[in-house]
């Protein structure tokens, strides 16, 4: 494309504007800004010189337009974005010149094949060099947060933008990520609500429909920004924002424009959810210009008397993926992409998705085994149970080689006491040695089962007692930063030497598994206790409890036949609590929907806590709650429970991806 004999010249933006308008604006529907036009003029002047009107120059603009559109950069071409696109194009062309002798035609074809965005249509595939053959192993990956692509919601363009990896070990939060943490959550949920038909602005097709609407006093569920309630005393509104507290310990609601004090004395909550500070909620009520405890010029005065409060409803995975343009949130296409640059957007096109779904339905023998929480390797009773389980798996592998699990996931904490430093240096060394010996014992057990060692991957997910965070958190979850990094290799090196290369997976918490078309999220946290401790108790809740206690007192604990509703199915308290937990997490679209004083978040990896779009499977590993399986908005959520309770019974779960089926199993030892 680049003519080596052409001498650079100095063009003015006005010279290139007609060509840029014809190609970028008229043909591709893009608008180039002034700074970008100047940058493009300089690039064309340097690359093509007196041949700036040639077909090669126009092809250069064509390629820029293709990449810009396929990267979803919006309709406005700005300077910084154009600079990045030109650099990527130049780097690619340089590699092609060295391998293909600089042929202009070959360069153009290569550019089309190696666009930074993989979004092939069905008619111009192949996807993986073979149109009708896919290797399932290419689409089975265990993904830690530092390997997961980072997409950030752009409130101006109303879409997700890819944030390139810095390839740096980000140990601590930076200022920007801390500031953007709640902003990102707000804008992402706000965008979800804008697609929900229950919160759409009214549309009228005729004057008669407007008159009919006014005559019937039809009310809409349009969400109002907090700044727009000022001066509208006594009016009814629906607001959306972050629920938190101010300096006076009063509840406030905050959105992107302002915050306002809430009066919750008459509030009725939507049943089936927890309501904690740090969650984004929808409130309905009446604004009063008086009555607020905070009265200064910097905030909206008065208070908002809430009548109803609820969560923003979750959106099904298929709809979210479609609205976000089928982005590759798991990076499964990265290894199959011809471009070596990791810092670019990838997509999972519909044709590939259909092939993956069809393929996974044929792999009926594939399964994942997830053990219960708190796999204390310093407990001899638990080691006996693990030995019994591994023996059972080994026997099944000998009887039927096709019935092998793809991965066995062990959930921490892997020690019953947190690994902490002590005043004595000798004791401190002893603590780490004891912790390392726990995994050495696991290696000794595994060495007796050669089929498991050779054929099955082992994944480790840390808990609150595992290093290195346990050294300062002392096993307390409120001081344990999330996401939690994997267990250091110094403790698992013997286990790593035993297993074939790549078969030991040192996972983070949370951890993601991509199985063909499915996204599986695993998190170890005793989260239901956090919800219960921080759940807001409304005045109406107390009144209902008092009425219930009074009724029980009057009836002397007797149940009358008239009180039994035979039409409604009986739901156990455990399932009610499980549904409440699942609905809260999925509606919030975040694994840790709390304020930072409840849970410390490493905001550099906050995107790994986002569950929007909803995952296919969410596996909670809460040792304080029994096992359950609940489906909400197409997302299946389970809890594995505790690995070993008071009896000699080891609990684990088998998941069969082909049918999305779980089997809760137990081994007695």
Curated annotation (Swiss-Prot):
GO cellular component terms, semicolon-separated: cytoplasm; epsilon DNA polymerase complex; nuclear replication fork
Subcellular localization(s) per the UniProt record: Nucleus
Main location: nucleus
UniProt cross-references to Pfam families, sorted A to Z: DNA_pol_E_B (PF04042)
Region of interest called Disordered, as start-end residue ranges on this chain: 96-115
GO terms for biological process, alphabetical: DNA-templated DNA replication maintenance of fidelity; error-prone translesion synthesis
A single MF term (Gene Ontology): DNA-directed DNA polymerase activity
Keywords associated with the record: DNA replication, DNA-binding, Nucleus
Note: In eukaryotes there are five DNA polymerases: alpha, beta, gamma, delta, and epsilon which are responsible for different reactions of DNA synthesis.
Subunit structure: Heterotetramer. Consists of four subunits: POL2, DPB2, DPB3 and DPB4.
Similarity comment: Belongs to the DNA polymerase epsilon subunit B family.
Purpose of the protein: As accessory component of the DNA polymerase epsilon (DNA polymerase II) participates in chromosomal DNA replication.
Protein name (record): DNA polymerase epsilon subunit B
Species: Debaryomyces hansenii (strain ATCC 36239 / CBS 767 / BCRC 21394 / JCM 1990 / NBRC 0083 / IGC 2968)
Gene: DPB2
């Amino acid at each position: 494309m680049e003519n080596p004999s052409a001498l650079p010249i100095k063009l003015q933006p006005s010279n290139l504007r007609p060509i840029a308008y014809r190609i970028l604006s008229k043909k591709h529907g893009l608008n180039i800004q002034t700074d970008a036009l100047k940058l493009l003029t300089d690039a064309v002047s340097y690359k093509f010189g007196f041949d700036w009107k040639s077909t090669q120059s126009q092809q250069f603009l064509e390629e820029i337009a293709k990449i810009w559109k396929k990267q979803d950069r919006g309709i406005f071409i700005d300077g910084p974005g154009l600079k990045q696109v030109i650099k990527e194009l130049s780097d690619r062309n340089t590699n092609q010149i060295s391998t293909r002798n600089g042929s202009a035609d070959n360069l153009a074809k290569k550019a089309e094949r190696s666009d930074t965005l993989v979004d092939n249509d069905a008619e111009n595939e192949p996807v993986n060099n073979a149109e009708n053959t896919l290797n399932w192993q290419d689409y089975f990956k265990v993904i830690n947060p530092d390997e997961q692509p980072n997409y950030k919601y752009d409130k101006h363009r109303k879409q997700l933008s890819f944030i390139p990896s810095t390839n740096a070990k980000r140990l601590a939060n930076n200022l920007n990520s801390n500031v953007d943490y709640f902003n990102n959550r707000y804008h992402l949920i706000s965008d979800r609500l804008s697609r929900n038909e229950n919160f759409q602005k009214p549309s009228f097709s005729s004057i008669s429909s407007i008159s009919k609407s006014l005559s019937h006093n039809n009310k809409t569920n349009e969400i109002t920004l907090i700044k727009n309630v000022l001066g509208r005393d006594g009016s009814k509104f629906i607001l959306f924002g972050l629920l938190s507290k101010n300096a006076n310990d009063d509840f406030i609601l905050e959105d992107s424009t302002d915050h306002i004090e809430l009066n919750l004395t008459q509030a009725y909550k939507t049943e089936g959810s927890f309501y904690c500070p740090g969650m984004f909620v929808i409130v309905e009520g009446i604004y009063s210009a008086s009555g607020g405890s905070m009265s200064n010029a910097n905030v909206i005065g008065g208070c908002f008397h809430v009548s109803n409060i609820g969560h923003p409803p979750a959106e099904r995975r298929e709809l979210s993926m479609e609205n976000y343009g089928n982005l590759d949130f798991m990076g499964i296409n990265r290894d199959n992409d011809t471009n070596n640059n990791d810092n670019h957007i990838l997509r999972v096109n519909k044709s590939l998705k259909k092939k993956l779904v069809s393929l996974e339905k044929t792999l009926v023998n594939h399964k994942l085994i997830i053990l219960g929480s708190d796999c204390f390797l310093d407990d001899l009773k638990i080691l006996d149970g693990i030995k019994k389980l591994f023996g059972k798996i080994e026997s099944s592998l000998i009887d039927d080689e096709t019935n092998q699990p793809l991965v066995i996931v062990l959930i921490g904490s892997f020690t019953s006491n947190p690994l902490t430093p002590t005043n004595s240096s000798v004791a401190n060394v002893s603590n780490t040695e004891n912790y390392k010996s726990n995994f050495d014992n696991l290696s000794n057990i595994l060495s007796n089962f050669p089929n498991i060692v050779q054929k099955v991957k082992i994944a480790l997910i840390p808990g609150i007692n595992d290093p290195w965070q346990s050294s300062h958190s002392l096993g307390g979850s409120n001081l344990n930063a999330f996401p939690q990094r994997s267990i250091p290799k110094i403790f698992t090196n013997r286990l790593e030497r035993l297993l074939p290369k790549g078969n030991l997976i040192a996972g983070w918490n949370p951890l993601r598994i991509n199985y063909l078309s499915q996204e599986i999220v695993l998190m170890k946290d005793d989260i239901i206790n956090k919800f219960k401790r921080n759940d807001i108790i409304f005045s109406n809740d107390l009144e209902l409890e008092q009425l219930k206690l009074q009724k029980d007192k009057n009836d002397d604990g007797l149940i009358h036949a008239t009180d039994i509703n035979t039409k409604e199915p009986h739901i156990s308290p455990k399932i009610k609590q499980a549904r409440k937990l699942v609905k809260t997490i999925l509606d919030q679209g975040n694994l840790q929907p709390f304020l930072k004083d409840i849970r410390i978040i490493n905001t550099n990896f906050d995107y790994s806590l986002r569950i929007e779009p909803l995952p296919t499977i969410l596996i909670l590993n809460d040792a304080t709650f029994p096992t359950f399986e609940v489906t909400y908005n197409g997302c299946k959520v389970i809890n594995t429970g505790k690995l070993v309770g008071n009896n000699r019974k080891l609990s684990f779960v088998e998941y069969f991806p082909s049918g999305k089926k779980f089997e809760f199993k137990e081994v007695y030892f």
